């Protein structure tokens, strides 16, 4: 069978093989005028961990559960070599689990929890290591922070770089960044069509087609259409929190496998969902209410969540020599979203006209223009090996939001896109210019020192009268010391920081506060076993955040906490244990605490665990090839309980019972899934069962404390695949 996932030299996912080759490292084209850099080929000693190589053959194997390459560190390299914790969700893993949305894929990431609604941030919204990631979503290394629900049909893998990463990506948080890696063209002609059906009206069709147009030119097209019902419904009118999504990803490359490569990418995604705001908390029990069954839905047949996303990119890669490359990306992105959701009611049952529950309405339009250019090179200086990176980035952001007008003059409610209240739109314009540089120095054999710095200048302006024009000029650093005693062992200690101004969140507060700062120290180890087929990692970290910003657009508070901390332990294993047995698993322990409360907040909140930060998370997915084309698999995703409360409250009596801190709490859970597959050269069939035991669990919480969203009930999905 011709593998649709064969890789090309400049792709973000090289082959499974681990053989010595030259890595390509990042400066911007705009900084290169009049500058030249000599690069000299170096032969790594046998004890130095070899960098990845790339197979250019049509039938190169795709990654299994272990990713062999990533560009999340701005350099195409094996995740094993990065002095920072990295989790990669591969395409194979997503296919085996029948993953459609980014949210479902990220269930494979330990230490990650899901937020619900967030007062307007009802798109993809997660916490990593207890810190929000709203401003840390990326697509091929470029910011993708708009509010929408992302899909995986056009993704090759998802890289999660843990810890502060502002030196590499710009303003951000302590938890880390989530970088989506898109599929790219290959040489050769091949394709795949997949169709899936399941209970609760699940229907999905995807297509992945690659066409060779010339010796160095190729086109790749990915398409998707999915419809889903739900196990939950409104008893008054039968409405369900439905999903209706369709998308297209197109990529054309010329100069493939040459020193001068140009790629054009275009991506569109349309969603027409009925949003789900879950179940209210009971003020007496501090748990999701039992007054209504967990399958009760407060939305109606008229509520909606419509979004249209469009992105066009040009990527130019030019090899200055065998040891130096410049890579430039230009992207225009447009995001349009409008929704009406009904938040649940603690005492009143759902109605057909929206008269019960609380309406959440908003229309947002965002337009981003990004230019990013990186120069990477390898050279020797004073007898030491250097891996150099330098870059420049310009980002222009333009966003507006408005509230919708209730068109029903009676007791019910009715909203429609484009029907606004008389209040003017709230707008945000921001211009960011950044310069960054990094050097990884092998100063003695097997020891490497990474030193990096970045400076961001942000000029932002709000239309809100009590929001001044904001100018921020901040620097970030990244350091790491690595020891490679063998080619398969890596021990490191790293330190990084990051910043995020109010402007980053579009929270529109008129208050004047210092920029949010995060500092992360991490001690880690990475091992490669089974001749490189199995990767293990362990990390101990401390993450501190000061002047933590509020991300809830419904709230007027700007600061959540003055200082908070998470101390954590992470363990992860990914890859092949035997030729037939693969595994992907992660375990996370988090000890989180509010060290200093927000100005004016209740002093009793100091020392408490922050919101939506479970003490423990665990995920496991494992498959075994039985022979004759048969494969079985299964796994579990588990989280301990998560708090939901307002940390800015001046009087937090509702969170204390007899002096004991007792906020609203989403209970811990464990969800078990299973898979059975039969694979042949040109076709395959797969049966997935999600939530085998049909447990009611709450996988997302609105961290202000209002409600929690139940996870999927038992889902049975049958998939057929044709490959040619």
Regions found by a protein language model. Name each.
Residues 190, 197-228, 232-274, 304-315:
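Transmembrane beta-barrel wall of Gram-negative outer-membrane proteins
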């Amino acid at each position: 069978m011709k593998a649709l996932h064969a890789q090309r030299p400049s792709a973000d996912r090289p082959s499974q093989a681990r053989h010595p080759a030259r890595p390509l490292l990042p400066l911007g084209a705009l900084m290169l005028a009049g500058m030249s850099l000599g690069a000299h080929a170096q032969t790594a000693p046998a004890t130095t961990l070899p960098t990845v190589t790339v197979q250019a053959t049509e039938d190169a194997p795709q990654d299994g559960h272990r990713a062999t390459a990533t560009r999340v560190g701005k350099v195409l390299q094996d995740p094993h070599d990065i002095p920072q914790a990295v989790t990669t969700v591969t395409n194979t893993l997503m296919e085996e689990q029948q993953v459609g949305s980014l949210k479902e894929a990220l269930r494979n990431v330990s230490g990650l929890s899901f937020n619900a609604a967030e007062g307007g941030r009802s798109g993809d919204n997660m916490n990593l290591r207890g810190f929000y990631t709203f401003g840390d979503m990326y697509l091929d290394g470029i910011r993708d922070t708009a509010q929408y629900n992302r899909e995986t049909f056009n993704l090759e893998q998802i890289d999660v770089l843990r810890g502060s990463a502002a030196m590499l990506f710009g303003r951000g948080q302590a938890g880390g960044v989530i970088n989506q890696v898109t599929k790219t063209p290959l040489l050769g002609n091949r394709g795949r069509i997949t169709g899936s059906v399941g209970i609760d009206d699940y229907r999905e069709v995807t297509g992945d087609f690659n066409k060779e147009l010339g010796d160095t030119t190729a086109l790749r097209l990915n398409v998707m259409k999915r419809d889903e019902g739900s196990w939950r419904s409104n008893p008054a009118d039968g409405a369900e929190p439905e999903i209706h999504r369709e998308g297209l990803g197109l990529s054309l490359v010329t100069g493939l496998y040459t020193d001068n490569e140009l790629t054009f990418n275009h991506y569109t995604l349309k969603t027409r969902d009925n949003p789900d705001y879950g179940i209210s908390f009971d003020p007496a029990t501090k748990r999701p209410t039992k007054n209504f069954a967990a399958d009760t839905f407060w939305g109606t047949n008229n509520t909606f969540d419509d979004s249209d996303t469009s992105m066009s990119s040009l990527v130019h890669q030019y090899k200055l020599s065998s040891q130096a490359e410049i890579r430039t990306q230009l992207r225009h992105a447009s995001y349009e979203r409008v929704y009406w959701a009904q938040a649940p009611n603690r005492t009143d049952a759902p109605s057909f006209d929206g008269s019960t529950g609380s309406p959440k309405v908003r229309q947002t339009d965002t337009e981003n223009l990004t230019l990013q250019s990186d120069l990477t090179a390898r050279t020797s200086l004073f007898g030491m090996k250097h891996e150099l990176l330098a870059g420049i980035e310009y980002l222009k952001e333009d966003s507006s939001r408005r509230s919708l007008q209730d068109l029903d003059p009676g007791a019910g409610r009715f909203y429609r896109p484009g029907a606004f209240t008389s209040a003017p739109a709230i707008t945000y314009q921001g211009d960011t210019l950044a310069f960054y540089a990094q050097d990884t120095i092998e100063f003695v054999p097997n020891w490497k020192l990474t030193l990096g710095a970045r400076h961001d200048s942000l000029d932002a302006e709000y239309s809100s009268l009590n929001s001044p024009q904001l100018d921020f000029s901040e620097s970030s650093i990244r350091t790491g010391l690595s020891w490679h005693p063998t080619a398969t062992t890596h021990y490191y200690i790293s330190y990084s920081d990051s910043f995020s101004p109010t402007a980053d969140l579009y929270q529109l507060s008129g208050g004047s506060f210092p920029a949010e700062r995060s500092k992360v120290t991490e001690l880690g180890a990475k091992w490669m076993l089974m001749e490189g087929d199995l990767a293990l990692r362990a990390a101990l970290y401390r993450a501190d955040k000061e002047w933590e910003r509020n991300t809830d657009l419904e709230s007027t508070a700007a600061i959540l906490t003055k200082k908070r901390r998470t101390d954590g332990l992470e363990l992860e294993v990914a890859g092949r244990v035997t030729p037939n047995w693969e595994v992907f698993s992660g375990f996370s322990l988090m000890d989180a605490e509010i060290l200093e409360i927000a100005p004016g907040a209740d002093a009793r909140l100091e020392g408490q665990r922050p919101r939506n930060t479970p003490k423990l998370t665990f995920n496991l997915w494992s498959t075994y090839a039985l022979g004759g084309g048969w494969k079985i698999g299964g796994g579990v995703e588990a989280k301990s309980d998560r708090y939901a409360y307002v940390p800015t409250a001046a009087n937090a009596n509702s969170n204390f019972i007899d002096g004991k801190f007792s906020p609203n709490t989403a209970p811990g859970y464990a969800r078990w899934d299973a898979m059975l597959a039969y694979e042949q050269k040109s076709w395959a069939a797969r049966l997935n069962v999600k939530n085998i035991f049909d447990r009611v669990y709450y996988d997302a919480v609105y961290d202000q404390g209002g409600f929690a969203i139940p996870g999927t009930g038992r889902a049975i999905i049958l998939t057929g695949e044709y490959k040619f």
